[in-house]
């Protein structure tokens, strides 16, 4: 059981040295590297690890690396983000679907038949284009957390962003850097890809009827299934995809350019999932800006449907018709398509997904007891895991750094000593509810305090990552005892990978586990209900998304009982 966070003094020192970026956002500076001394800021309960930590902090190489990292933070608006993109995403060679690229389900829209599908798709495209212009015209309401404004630059990265496969490290291209925004999208149907203009010749977005007419035009050319859809190779291992990409680019430059420059991709396929997937490189990934900005877009699309806020008046200006992308492929390319298709089918079949709508209560219950809803839900997941596996789960929770310019994420960790005490006490045969209430409150406050530290730039995970990267850059063959120790490596093996992505509409979002025997758990706490998307790998003999979902419900019920049957349910302490 391990927790590593910065000391109380570090937050003050950090605040004092922050600068404002050119956009008026706080610049992410570096916290002092200090040894935690009290219980709340302990490094570990393990004396061996503490000894290694003391040695680590007194190491001359570490102190030199810390100075270099501090200098980097003084010369950049965000010392972390460029490295984070490279090491967490672009250098990763694993396939994008399942773990890196999240999936999301829209509410069921009421339509029937092909015509209804095309009208619904046209409205969705129209709404997404409207949101694009809201971003360009700075019409979005500023995001805030606890009254603090958040960096909005990530919204600029949603449209036209493409990850180009390269050997060893991919390349990221942003639509905003193209000089001129694209005016087309890619539509995929039955494995066929189409370049579809969505603006008229004067640069005005097409109306819903005009977009629908564009979609109608591709139907006749996509009735049969394309046996060799090259898009599917983008779902493969990144080096394998890079090898195919290098081959096909020679004879398909125009088609590839059309895909890479598109604003976004739309798939008009069957619900059984047997049609070929759209291009993974051009889909909404965490690399585009994270869950919350994408969630805001999805909420906006749903709002447009609720309000029927669509432009149905067509302009008189002409617009270009869709054009089919015909790829010239070799036998090697066709074999690569078959192999990639088999691999993604196998990976998809191995993923267990449980969508849980917990409608007994939502944020209202923990809030009424003066408890943080997020911390409350995190403890419920800790309890569920412990009851299933009789062990504590090394847990990753996404902590936003959007308070800072170009901010991405850091890690909010569990378990800690307080959460462990609560979980163990709750799992005892005859739990004392009055004691459980005390443990629950302490565990919630401990998690909430560390969450605030992380979001204020005082998290330890990215700090250690920075030191590790610098060490490798300075001396590629060097090893730092702590950063190569089994204890540190275990810290990076997350049995629970969690993230809160709040939306107003019911938009379940999910992703796969970080470990073969772990769980992915994306959750959306609303006022009177909580939605979870829980995943596990079917090949694991240890994890089960279904069993976890049942134990999670039991934990949530038990935690409400603790509130209702003690003074927690009668008083409302200040959050």
Model-predicted segments: where are they?
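Long, Pro/Ser/Thr-rich low-complexity/intrinsically disordered regulatory tracts in eukaryotic proteins
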Residues: 1-575
């Amino acid at each position: 059981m391990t927790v590593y966070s910065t000391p109380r003094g570090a937050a003050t020192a950090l605040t004092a040295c922050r600068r404002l970026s050119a956009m008026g956002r706080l610049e992410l500076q570096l916290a002092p590297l200090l040894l935690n001394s009290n219980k709340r800021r302990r490094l570990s309960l393990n004396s061996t690890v503490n000894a290694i930590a003391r040695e680590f902090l007194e190491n001359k190489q570490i102190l030199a690396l810390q100075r270099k990292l501090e200098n980097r933070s003084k010369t950049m608006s965000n010392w972390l983000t460029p490295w984070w993109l490279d090491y967490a995403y672009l250098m990763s060679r694993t396939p994008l679907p399942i773990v890196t690229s999240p999936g999301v389900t829209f509410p069921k829209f009421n339509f029937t038949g092909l015509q209804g599908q095309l009208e619904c798709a046209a409205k969705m495209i129209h709404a997404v284009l409207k949101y694009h212009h809201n971003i360009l015209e700075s019409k979005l309401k500023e995001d805030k957390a606890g009254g603090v404004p958040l960096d909005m630059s990530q919204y600029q990265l949603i449209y036209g962003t493409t990850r180009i496969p390269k050997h060893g490290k991919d390349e990221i291209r942003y639509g905003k850097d193209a000089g001129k925004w694209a005016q087309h999208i890619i539509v995929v149907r039955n494995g066929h890809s189409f370049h579809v203009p969505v603006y008229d010749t004067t640069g005005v977005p097409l109306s819903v009827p005009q977009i629908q007419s564009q979609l109608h035009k591709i139907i006749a050319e996509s009735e049969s299934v394309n046996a060799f859809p090259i898009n599917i190779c983008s779902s493969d291992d990144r080096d394998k995809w890079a090898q195919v990409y290098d081959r096909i680019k020679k004879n398909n430059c125009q088609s590839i350019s059309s895909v890479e420059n598109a604003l976004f991709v739309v798939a008009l396929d069957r619900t059984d999932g047997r049609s070929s997937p759209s291009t993974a490189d051009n889909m909404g990934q965490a690399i585009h800006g994270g869950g919350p900005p994408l969630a805001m877009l999805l909420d906006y699309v749903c709002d447009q449907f609720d309000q029927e806020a669509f432009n149905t008046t067509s302009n008189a200006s002409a617009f270009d018709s869709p054009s089919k992308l015909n790829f010239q492929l070799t036998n090697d390319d066709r074999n690569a398509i078959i192999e990639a298709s088999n691999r993604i089918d196998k990976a998809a079949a191995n993923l267990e997904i449980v969508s849980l709508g917990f409608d007994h209560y939502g944020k209202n219950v923990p809030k009424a007891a003066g408890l943080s809803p997020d911390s409350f839900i995190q403890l419920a997941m800790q309890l569920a895991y412990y009851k299933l596996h009789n062990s504590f789960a090394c847990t990753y929770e996404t902590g936003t750094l959007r308070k800072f310019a170009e901010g991405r994420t850091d890690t909010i960790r569990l378990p800690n000593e307080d959460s462990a005490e609560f979980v163990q006490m709750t799992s005892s045969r005859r739990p004392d509810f009055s004691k459980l209430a005390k443990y629950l409150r302490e565990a919630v406050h401990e998690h909430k305090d560390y969450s605030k530290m992380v979001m204020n730039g005082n998290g330890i995970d990215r700090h250690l990552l920075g030191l590790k990267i610098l060490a490798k850059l300075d001396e590629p063959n060097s090893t730092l005892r702590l950063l190569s120790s089994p204890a540190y490596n275990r810290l990076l093996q997350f049995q629970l990978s969690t993230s809160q992505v709040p939306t107003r509409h019911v938009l379940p979002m999910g992703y796969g586990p970080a470990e073969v025997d772990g769980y992915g758990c994306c959750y959306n706490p609303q006022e009177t209900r909580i939605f979870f998307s829980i995943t596990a790998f079917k090949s694991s003999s240890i994890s089960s998304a279904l069993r976890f979902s049942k134990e999670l419900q039991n934990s949530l019920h038990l935690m409400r009982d603790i509130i209702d049957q003690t003074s927690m349910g009668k008083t409302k302490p200040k959050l």
